[in-house]
C-alpha cells in the first residue's frame, strides 16, 4: 500500500474514533462511526485476495446494519425528547435499540458471527486494529450511557458472550479465529461489569488491549497463523515462542499472570453487588477459554507435529533487533498481577 494512502487511512481511523469519544451530539457520533468504518475497509482488503474481499464485505454489511439501528434509536429518542445530547437517552425503546447496535459493532453475542470470519480473512496487522482500536468507540458510548442503559439486556449479552467465546474457540486451529473468540469473551466480561463499575471496565479494556497487542506482535514477528506453524516456530525462535505461550496463558486468566487480575476483580465486584449466580456461571465458562489456551500451549511445547521437512534450529540472534518493543509489552501482559491491591481502590 502507498505510504501516503496508508497514512491518510490511519489518520481517518484515529479521527473517527476520536470524534465518537469526544462528541456530545448524536449526529457527530454517527458521523464518527461512519468515518471509522469506511476507513478501515481498505485496510481489511489490502491483501487483494478473495478471502479478504469477503471479510471486508461481511464487515461492511454488519457495521452498516448497526449504523442503521443507531440512526433509528437516535430518531426515536429525538421524537420523544427533542434533544440530540448523548447522555439524554430517555426513551427505553431507543435505549434497547442503541444497545443492540453497539453490541453489533463490538461483536457481542448473539451478534458475534462476523468477528471470527472477518478476523480470519484479514492480515494480522488489520486483525490487530479490528480487535483493539475498533472496540474503543462503541465502548466509550456504552460507558457514557452506563447509568441509563438496560441492565438485563447487557448482562444477558455479557454472559452469552463469555459462553460463546469459550465454546467457539474449542475446536479451532487458526490462531486468528482463536483470538477473535477470545475477544468476544473479553468483551463479555467488560460489559457485564459496566453497570456496576465503569472504571473496572476501562481497566479490563486496557489490559485486554495490551495482551492482544503483545500476542499479535509476536504472531507478526514469527509469521504464525495456525497451530501447526506455531509448533514449527518453536525450532526457529524458542524465546519468542515461549513469550507467545506465556501471553496465551495470561489471556486465559491463569494466575499468577496479568490476565487473572481483571477476572478476579470483576468476580469480586459482582459478588459485592449481591450477584452470585452470574459470577459463578462466568467463572465456570472462563475455564473453557483457559482450556483451549492450555491445550494450545501443551501441543506446542510438549508435542511435536509430524513434518516431512527436516526442521533445523535457526540462529537464535536473528530476531534480537525486532524484540526491543516486545520487552515492555511482555512485562505489562504477564507480570502486573502484584499491582492488584493498588487497582482495588478503583471505583
UniProtKB/Swiss-Prot annotation:
GO cellular component terms attached to this protein's record: mitochondrial inner membrane
Localization annotation: Mitochondrion inner membrane
Family matches, as InterPro entries: Complex_I_Subunit_2, NADH_DH_su2_C, NADH_UbQ_OxRdtase_chain2, ND/Mrp_TM
A Pfam family recorded for this sequence: Proton_antipo_M
Membrane-related topology note: Multi-pass membrane protein
First-listed, main subcellular location of the protein, grouped into a coarse class: mitochondrion
Disulfide bonds: none
Alphabetized UniProt keyword annotations: Electron transport, Membrane, Mitochondrion, Mitochondrion inner membrane, NAD, Respiratory chain, Translocase, Transmembrane, Transmembrane helix, Transport, Ubiquinone
Catalytic activity: a ubiquinone + NADH + 5 H(+)(in) = a ubiquinol + NAD(+) + 4 H(+)(out)
Function: Core subunit of the mitochondrial membrane respiratory chain NADH dehydrogenase (Complex I) which catalyzes electron transfer from NADH through the respiratory chain, using ubiquinone as an electron acceptor. Essential for the catalytic activity and assembly of complex I.
PANTHER family: NADH-UBIQUINONE OXIDOREDUCTASE CHAIN 2 (PTHR46552:SF1)
Quaternary context: Core subunit of respiratory chain NADH dehydrogenase (Complex I) which is composed of 45 different subunits. Interacts with TMEM242.
Protein name, entry field: NADH-ubiquinone oxidoreductase chain 2
Organism: Gardnerycteris crenulata
Lineage: Eukaryota, Metazoa, Chordata, Craniata, Vertebrata
